[in-house]
UniProtKB/Swiss-Prot annotation:
PROSITE patterns: SECA, SECA_MOTOR_DEAD. This is Protein translocase subunit SecA. Keywords: ATP-binding, Cell inner membrane, Cell membrane, Cytoplasm, Membrane, Metal-binding, Nucleotide-binding, Protein transport, Translocase, Translocation, Transport, Zinc. It comes from Borrelia garinii subsp. bavariensis (strain ATCC BAA-2496 / DSM 23469 / PBi) (Borreliella bavariensis). Belongs to the SecA family. GO terms for cellular component: cell envelope Sec protein transport complex; cytosol; plasma membrane.
Amino acid sequence: MLKAVLEPAIGSKSKRDLKDYLPTLRNINKLERWALLLADEDFSKETQKLKYELKSGNSLENILERAFTLSREAARRRLKERPYDVQIIAGLALHEGKIIEMKTGEGKTLSSVQAAYLNSLTGDGVIIVTVNDYLAERDSNWMKPVFDLLGVTVGVVLSNMDYERRKDQYAKDITYVTNNELGFDYLRDNMRYDLNEKCLRKFNYCIIDEIDSILIDEARTPLIISGPTEGNTNAYLEVNSLVSFLKECSKDSKSGDYPLEIDDLDGDYTIDEKAKRISFTAKGLNNLEQLLVSKGIISGSLYTDSNFNYVHYMTQALKAHLLFFKNREYIVGDSGVEIVDEFTGRVLTGRRYSDGLHQAIEAKEEVRVANENKTMATITFQNLFRMFDKISGMTGTADTEAKEFHKIYNLDVVVVPTNRLLARIDEEDTIYYTEEFKFHAITDEVYKTYKKGQPVLVGTASIEKSEILSAMFKNRGIKHEVLNAKNHSREAFIIAEAGAKHAVTIATNMAGRGTDIKLGGNIEHRVRKKIGTNVSLEEFQEAVKNERENYLKDYNEVKSLGGLYVIGSERHESRRIDNQLRGRSGRQGDPGRSRFYVSLEDDLMRLFAGDSLRSLMGKLGMATGEPITHSLLTKSLINAQKRVEDRNFEIRKHLLEYDDVITKQRDFIYAQRNSILEDTAIKDRILIALEEYLSFLLEGTKGGSVSSVFLNEINLIFAYMLESLGSIENINSLDLKAKLMQIARANLDEKENLIGRDLFNGFLRYEYLKNIDFKFQEHLANLDSLREAVYLRSYANKNPITEYKEEGFLIFSELIKDIKVSTIRRVLQLKLDSNSSDFKSVKKSKNVNSIHKELSGILINENKNVSNVQVVRSSPKIGRNEPCYCGSGKKYKNCHGKS
């Protein structure tokens, strides 16, 4: 067996990686006899022994072999599955903080058990991250019997849980959770006004399932907590009708490119399909201004503050019409415009594009235009997971991105060989000039295969293409199923039958990841169809046993026909997505076949490889309607994909450089929040901040007279309190500072005595945190604007990142000062009297939403009410007709109670 482990490995690095694990694997195999003799009740006792050893100073490495042996035997007893040697090797790599690449059907979920169990013994918690709630719940329930036998607790966090349940689940030894929920919980924890309401504990160790999807595909989509904001939604309707009046700039007839010189551009705007960007020309802005004025939408110049937003509205309208298409980037359902994930093919329920793009698409599709949102907190997945002491991951496709994993995350990829040799035949790509010829060829190939009885899976890049092929199959009399975002409710049924004889399935990327297509069909699904769901577990197991003979007959028949035939209808930008589609065939040593059909009209070819391939095909003597299959062409396609992957890597690296600036600032703000939450003497903190600010204002006076700037500032801070000093212009600056500090301390002491120390400290904490949150939200918006501004400076040969870092630091320094000053001003100017001795701050619940944001300025909004993100009320609620706490003299309902 040990020799067989090495033989299938590809490449010298893989062999070296595997060779390093063999001595440990041998020792684990030798220990298996010891574990076999244990009674069930001994497992939890052995776990306690291992925990005691760790507390006594032993290391995880010294107990690793016993822990892996125990968990392997626990899996055999509870799941009737003994982890293969390759799965043990995978577990060892996961423990070391590496990424394992395992092919479909090789048991990644079971491979994670050993590493999770070992690392849970420290008591610091293990997080296992999945891509959706279904997998989190499924995997936790599936592995729970194993962990129960071992005596470690296991939990799961789902999107519908409140914070009390979340906190309880995160406290377990091992917790399953989605990447989105983990990120949102981190952001929500850092918006809380009570330490006891925080859900998470310190980030220790996490195992990320489908790590390439989360850390690469979703790396351009930062998580965001947002709240509603008022916006001019009518403007999107107004500009939507103007799209046809503006014209794209003319391109060179030979090269297909725009003129290099700006003065030579003839038209209103240019389109960058690769970056999904629209740019107005000077002529275009003039035409837009005339258009808006003639339609009565604006009056006067486009460049006034009140009118210039229409450039943004129009840009988004053009994007909506020219770069985002129905049944490709999104669908229109009962709930309006719904985004389709380009990598998974699934609907991103409740999420919205940002920056007005979603509103522009809604206007285009003539559905209700919703309000925009404002950012309250944000983090990228890169920086979320870099906070863990140790991370590792699993996927079927990681080796193509090994360079990025190493450079960004310092993670190595270990390619784990299959337990059985891969028998799938991967054929050279077949290439056509046009999409029409390609689709006809696919239909012919599927028809022949269908008649033979061999199951076929046809992968498409969009809903639109899946519907075109479906119509063509229908015309040829090919019975088939279509799996896309529009009929996802039938997914389980379609996938269960996709490996049966004569099965033909057209699917978007939904079938490319996480689906297990079994030859002959799915026996459990077949039994459910026969006996229904209203039966006992014993009856179901008996029915499965009785059906097994028929199933094995069907399995062997499909196997003899060549297994599952996977046809890709075009190449994706990423080789990983293509490999995921191919990976549906040839599971666990089964036979299979795969081939990609490509045309020069496909997006990848058109944008990244069209000219070179067209030239090469011409040299090979290819006519318009003829296909061609050649290793040179396949190599050219792969090179095009590599160029796109390198480009996307640079984009993600670029995003990370920007986000690192925000990360340092966010970490500082969150550390300040935590310090304030724990502080029992915030009055002293505020007085120290005031003294520092006064010293800053008095720098350079050297004890002389004060400046007008200083006088203006202290008037804003102290207001009515300065009356006792009389004329202050001639007071020595140092004496004035001492007097002001004396006034401030007396002011705060009086209020503290009036309502009590604890209550006053709670009020000060609330005011400080409220100021931090509000100002930081404004700061995030300012950073977004700054980023747009520095992007344009690249045209002036300036480095945008350097400019962003330098100016970002300056506005952050201003933010810190502003938070302190506004808090000082607020608490000093608050008037309390004896009639409001039971004054308390108002607990305000915030209507916030969780969002996702794509690199190209696209923000995806997960539109759900996060009720557990709230400001904590530290005092009883003020009556609506009572005087407002701000001292304005107005009733609360007519002042701060309006909102």
